[in-house]
Amino acid sequence: MGKLKSVVFDALPEHETCWSLTTAPNGKIYIGVCGELTGGLSVFLVQYDPETETTEYLLDVGEALGRSARSGATPISKVHYGMIPGHDGKLYCATHFSGPPVTDVVWRPWQTWDDPVRMACGLCLFTYDT
């Protein structure tokens, strides 16, 4: 029988979902730690090393893409299923919007579509060099 190991993301206490998980050629596991229920949270790219059992918080994706989760706009809150390790050592990722702006309690996309401040900017594709 296999061993069950829980990894807790202590540095992200308000983030509550993970929609993306992959193992890269370097043997490390990469996770998109998402914030969908609390307004104004950005997705984080986190690395877990199963050999050393250490966690490293690599990237606030929204900040890295110039879209601060605290700006009042719909935040980049999720890496949604799209996290592909390439043979070139890069992760190829796709973002998604599913968390409310910092000013909202609940995500209601139809209330932000025509708001020039709160609207989502569209999906983003990005790479991360592992």
For the regions a protein language model found, what residue spans apply to each?
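Surface-exposed loop and turn segments in beta-propeller and other repeat-based domains
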Residues: 5-10, 57-75
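Short, conserved, GDST-rich strand-edge loop motifs in beta-rich repeat architectures
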Residues: 32-43, 93-120
